[in-house]
C-alpha cells in the first residue's frame, strides 16, 4: 500500500490560517507560520481589549461628569456622594449623557446635591 502524505489536508489547514490573516501587513498575511502567530496574538489582544473597553468607557463617563460639575464648585466624588445621600439612582453613563445633551436637567441634579 502506498504512503499517503496528506497534502490536501495540510494545505486546507494552512489555507484556513492564511484566510484568517487576510488584511495583515507583509509576510503576516502570506507566510503560514507568521500568519498563525499573528492571528493567535490578535485573538489575545481582542480578548484583553474587550475587557478594557468597559474600563475605558467608565473613565470617560467619570471625566465628563467631573468636567460638568466643576463649574458648580463640586468635585466628582462630592457629586456622586451627594447623589447617593439624596437616593438618586442614575448610573454614570446616564449622568454623562445628561451632562452633554441635557445640561438643564443635569444642573437640577447638581442643585439637588448642593441643597439649593
From Swiss-Prot:
Q: Which Gene3D superfamilies match?
A: 6.10.160.10, Ribosomal protein L20
A GO BP term, please? ribosomal large subunit assembly
From the record, give the cysteines joined by S-S bonds: none
- Gene Ontology terms: cellular component: ribonucleoprotein complex; ribosome
The cross-references to NCBIfam families, in alphabetical order and at most eight, read: rplT_bact
Q: Which PANTHER family match?
A: 39S RIBOSOMAL PROTEIN L20
Q: What is this protein called?
A: Large ribosomal subunit protein bL20
What gene, per UniProt, encodes this protein?
Answer: rplT
Amino acid at each position: 500500500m502506498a504512503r499517503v502524505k496528506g497534502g490536501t489536508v495540510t494545505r486546507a489547514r494552512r489555507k484556513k490560517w492564511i484566510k484568517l490573516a487576510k488584511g495583515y501587513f507583509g509576510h503576516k498575511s502570506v507566510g503560514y507560520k507568521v500568519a498563525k502567530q499573528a492571528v493567535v496574538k490578535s485573538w489575545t489582544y481582542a480578548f484583553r481589549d474587550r475587557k478594557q473597553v468597559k474600563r475605558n468607557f467608565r473613565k470617560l463617563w467619570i471625566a465628563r461628569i467631573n468636567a460638568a460639575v466643576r463649574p458648580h464648585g463640586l468635585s466628582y466624588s462630592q457629586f456622586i456622594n451627594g447623589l447617593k445621600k439624596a437616593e438618586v439612582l442614575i448610573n454614570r453613563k446616564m449622568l454623562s449623557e445628561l451632562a452633554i445633551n441635557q445640561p438643564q436637567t443635569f444642573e437640577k441634579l447638581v442643585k439637588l446635591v448642593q441643597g439649593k
